[in-house]
Amino acid sequence: MKLHDLKPAPGSTRKSKRVGRGHGSGKGKTSGKGMMGQKARSGPNPYPHFEGGQNPLVRRMPYKRGFTNRFRVEYTVVNVGDLIEWNNGDVTPEALREVGLIKNLKQPIKVLGDGDLNVALKVRVHKVSASARQKIEAAGGSVELIDAAA
């Protein structure tokens, strides 16, 4: 048996330290509460974000109004007019990335109808606006929607 193996007997309890009973006890005078101040007084302490009567940070900030949908899907937008320079007939997320029209392949892509199109393209994206679909099909192309998880 060594000193670090010593343990109190099972079920034994230690007497609580009596505070405020003289300097010799080690917990005399201020009873472990330090010097003056609100925390040294009897009764509850001020709440955690209390700033001493100054207008609190929570009240200095403007209201956050409205609601944020956690499941909102952010789309990378590509316009029909951006696809004009396309020589290749297939428009896919990978091809758009190579050309530099999009940066992130993880974000789904939506094609919008701004601009004109006179080349037949096979467009494979996650979403297409009605006007973009109309312009692509009018130019002799086709639209195929792909799953967002893919």
UniProtKB/Swiss-Prot annotation:
The keyword rRNA-binding applies. Keywords: Ribonucleoprotein, Ribosomal protein, RNA-binding, rRNA-binding. GO terms for molecular function: rRNA binding; structural constituent of ribosome. It comes from the Bacteria. Residues 1-56 are annotated as: Disordered. One of its GO terms (biological process) is translation. Residues 14-26 have a biased composition (Basic residues). SUPFAM superfamilies: Ribosomal proteins L15p and L18e (SSF52080). Binds to the 23S rRNA. HAMAP family: Ribosomal_uL15. This is Large ribosomal subunit protein uL15. It comes from Herpetosiphon aurantiacus (strain ATCC 23779 / DSM 785 / 114-95). The gene is rplO.
